[in-house]
Amino acid sequence: MTHPTELPLSPLSALQFYATAPYPCSYLDGRIARSQVATPSHLINSDIYTELVKAGFRRSGVFTYRPYCDGCRACVPVRVPVRAFTPSRTQRRMWKRHRALVATVSPLHYDEEHYALYMRYQSARHAGGGMDRDSRDQYEQFLLQSRINSRLVEFRDLDASGGEPGKLRMVSMIDILGDGLSSVYTFFEPDDAHTSYGTYNILWQIEQARSLGLPYVYLGYWIRESPKMAYKANFHPLEGLLDGRWKTLDPARVDLPPVDAALARAPLPGGHSGAG
């Protein structure tokens, strides 16, 4: 276990960091990935997690990690500077289209309707990826376990009758950091075609950060070669963490070191490759 030299000694000096064994990359087919994990998880409070996010870490439940892959630097942590953000014409259109959705912010909690939407989303968008078979316990471990300042946001249609809540359209989990909001995960109604709910959700988070006086919205990792991550490049300006520094990012021009194909496609222990 080591302390990465690029991380400040305080308040992270109480943490330890280790590298995982290689595993198949979930973003790029045929690639092998590794992660660097921050432990122990019970010491990672909101202040410490803010510093970790600024150093490129993310979380899945109480598991805090960042990419640590041999021969590959495709994952670039990105964030939107709230004050400088200017929506595109398409984004303004999406904002206007969905502005009637009612957003309700609450502490993390289990809701059967949320889980049902999650399963529909996974089955439609990520069939065969494993998450489309998540049990309720796995769903809770992935999205509802947190030791930091986290919130669940549900988006529903406005119910004109004033009776029952309107139809659930989207659920989003966010972390509230010292310097911004961090988008954890979002799922939405997959049967609604061409809605761009994901884009609207980020626009909503940017507006929330602005109202809270927070300078950034962290979007996780942008991967140029991954179509699933391409939408993040549509928010301007965008900052990326490159060589340990946050810089304004031009996705069309960013100079990433070439992937070492021999390392990135190395076989997993036991002779299994990362393909498939």
Curated annotation (Swiss-Prot):
Protein name, entry field: Aspartate/glutamate leucyltransferase
Its job: Functions in the N-end rule pathway of protein degradation where it conjugates Leu from its aminoacyl-tRNA to the N-termini of proteins containing an N-terminal aspartate or glutamate.
Organism of origin: Burkholderia vietnamiensis (strain G4 / LMG 22486) (Burkholderia cepacia (strain R1808))
Gene coding for it: bpt
EC number(s) reported in the record: 2.3.2.29
Membership in a protein family: Belongs to the R-transferase family. Bpt subfamily.
HAMAP family (UniProt xref): Bpt
UniProt KW Cytoplasm keyword: yes
Biological processes annotated in GO: ubiquitin-dependent protein catabolic process via the N-end rule pathway
Location(s), subcellular: Cytoplasm
A Pfam cross-reference name: ATE_N
Listed GO MF terms: arginyl-tRNA--protein transferase activity; leucyl-tRNA--protein transferase activity
Enzyme class: transferase
Known catalytic reactions: N-terminal L-glutamyl-[protein] + L-leucyl-tRNA(Leu) = N-terminal L-leucyl-L-glutamyl-[protein] + tRNA(Leu) + H(+); N-terminal L-aspartyl-[protein] + L-leucyl-tRNA(Leu) = N-terminal L-leucyl-L-aspartyl-[protein] + tRNA(Leu) + H(+)
The UniProt record lists the keyword Cytoplasm: yes
Keyword annotations from UniProtKB, A to Z: Acyltransferase, Cytoplasm, Transferase
GO cellular component: cytoplasm
